[in-house]
Structures are given as structure tokens and as C-alpha cells.
A protein has these predicted regions:
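Domain-level signal for soluble alpha/beta catalytic cores
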Residues: 1-291
């Protein structure tokens, strides 16, 4: 895995482009709603490979492996918790096969839906879940880790503890948050990001936030608290649920790219897209950054 120092050299050279949405684009490719994304991808690998090749062609430098909910506690719903390490390793290897010229981040996410509290017993459970997933991600050859769509500081602390125990060198932390910089738990994000910096995070920021005129300001607020590279991976605006039951986004790629350029000007060093974005959004962002 990359060290924090190697990762920071990459961020110092230029703005780093991440990828866009995975789940919503896989649904467009035929993945049924409500299924286990991780197992569906292993059964239909070409759908993921096609999507990630498009991202690489658009300029993506870091691909997120499709391991979003590949922790034991989530895989248990499919009776697959015993295969946690193997599933994560296979999914990372699948993303690694897309290109030799990009980095692959092992993707972890919130486990808030699986716990009623963050007392000592539950915190230890989260750490063990993340440890098993991280082992698989490292076995598969992940270059770094990304813990994204986090909702609570305790989740980030559990990931950080697990990463340290497993010897993972480079981990980014990304929260979903309000435009004013508060988490959905009500706590202010800034001090939490500062504590993650002190704990050895490689980058911090946000994702799954609706891109709008306030997004660049959110980048500015977070930069007051940290010297780390700030990650910005918002949605393509606000979704509308269609008659097909899927979320639809009206923001165009050029509109999104304009906002991302402003986020870059406010100091964001890692730019990508979340729900509702695709390779066209990444390509438009790349063009906006180079004009």
C-alpha cells in the first residue's frame, strides 16, 4: 500500500481525479434494486469493468473498488460473512485489472444501521468487522483505503483503529454532512477531521452531499480545520424518485464541473462524483480544470 507520504506527494503535484458513482450506474447496467452489489458484481464482472474503464478514459486516477458494504456484518444477510476476506480480495483484483495506470482504493462505509449505540462492546464489534474487510482489501492489492459516507465520528475512529491494527498505510475519510459542515449526528465535522489528521489520516472530506452553490463554501469551512488534502465527491444535485423507483438527477455534467472547479479553487485536492454522476461528469470536471 501507499504510505501517507507517497500519497501526499501525489496530491501536491496536481488535483487528483476520483471516479463517479458505482451503484446507480450498475443499476442502469441491469443490477436489480436491493440485491447484494458485491456478489452481483462478481457474477457480472463485465458491467463493473466497462464502467471503470470509462472512468479511466475520462481521467480518473483513483478507482474505488466495489466493496462498499463487504463487511461481515452486512454480508451476513446473504450468509456470506465467512467469505468476507475472499470477496474483498476478488473485488479489488477486479478493479486492479482495469488499468495499470490508476490506483485502486478499497472502499469501506458506515455500519450505523447495524448498531444501536457506540458503547465499548459495539465499538469492538465495528473494529473487528472493519479489520476483516481491510485484510481482504490488502490481500487483493489495494493501494489505499477510503472510508466513505460515514455518519458518525465513532465509525471513523473504528476504521482508524482497524487500519492501524492491520498495518494499512494510507486511509482517506469521507463523511456525508450538511452544507453548514455538521454531520447528520449533529456534531460539527471540522474538529472531527482535525482529530483524524492527528490520528494519521491521509485525506479527509465529504461525499454524497448534493452539489450546489454552497458546496465550494463547505470545502472552505473544512480547510480551516485541517492541512490534509480535502476530498470532495458530491452528488449530481438533489434526486427525484421516478416511477421506476430509481433516483434521477437533473444536474448536467457541465453544471457539476463548474461547481467542482470552484471547489478546487477553494482548496479541494481530490475531486470526484457520487450518486447520479458518471464518466461524463468526470470528463467534464477534468476539462474544467485544464481550461
Amino acid at each position: 500500500m501507499l504510505t501517507r507520504q507517497e500519497f501526499h506527494k501525489l496530491c501536491d503535484r496536481s488535483t487528483v481525479l476520483l471516479d463517479g458513482a458505482t451503484g446507480s450506474n450498475l443499476q442502469k447496467a441491469g443490477m436489480p434494486r436491493g440485491c447484494c452489489t458485491e456478489t452481483w458484481v462478481l457474477e457480472h464482472p463485465e458491467a463493473l469493468l466497462c464502467l471503470q474503464r470509462e472512468y479511466v478514459q475520462a481521467g480518473t486516477q483513483i478507482l474505488y473498488a466495489p466493496t462498499f458494504q463487504a463487511q461481515p456484518i452486512a454480508l451476513a444477510r446473504q450468509g456470506l460473512e465467512g467469505q468476507t476476506e475472499a470477496i474483498n480480495a476478488k473485488l479489488v483484483q477486479l478493479s486492479r485489472s482495469v488499468s495499470d495506470n490508476v490506483l485502486v482504493a478499497g472502499d469501506l462505509t458506515t455500519l450505523a444501521a447495524f448498531t444501536d449505540s457506540f458503547d465499548d462492546a459495539n465499538f469492538d464489534l465495528l473494529v473487528e468487522n472493519y479489520r476483516r474487510q481491510i485484510r481482504g482489501l490488502m490481500d487483493g492489492g489495494a493501494d489505499l483505503l477510503i472510508a466513505e459516507t460515514l455518519m458518525y465520528a465513532e465509525e471513523a475512529e473504528a476504521v482508524a483503529t482497524a487500519a492501524e491494527l492491520e498495518g494499512a498505510g494510507c486511509c482517506m475519510y469521507s463523511f456525508t454532512m450538511q452544507p453548514d459542515g455538521s454531520l447528520f449526528s449533529g456534531r460539527e465535522a471540522g474538529p472531527i477531521l482535525k482529530s483524524l489528521e492527528e490520528a494519521g489520516a491521509a485525506a479527509v472530506g465529504f461525499n454524497c452531499v448534493a452539489a450546489d452553490l454552497s458546496t465550494p463554501g463547505l470545502v472552505g469551512k473544512l480547510r480551516r480545520y485541517t492541512k490534509l488534502p480535502v476530498l470532495c465527491k458530491p452528488n449530481a444535485g438533489v434526486p427525484v424518485i421516478g416511477s421506476d423507483g430509481l433516483a434521477h438527477y437533473d444536474m448536467s455534467a457541465p453544471e457539476f464541473a463548474k461547481i467542482m472547479l470552484q471547489c478546487c479553487q477553494m482548496g479541494a485536492r481530490l475531486l470526484g462524483g457520487c450518486c447520479g454522476t458518471d464518466a461524463g461528469f468526470i470528463a467534464a470536471t477534468r476539462q474544467a480544470l485544464t481550461e
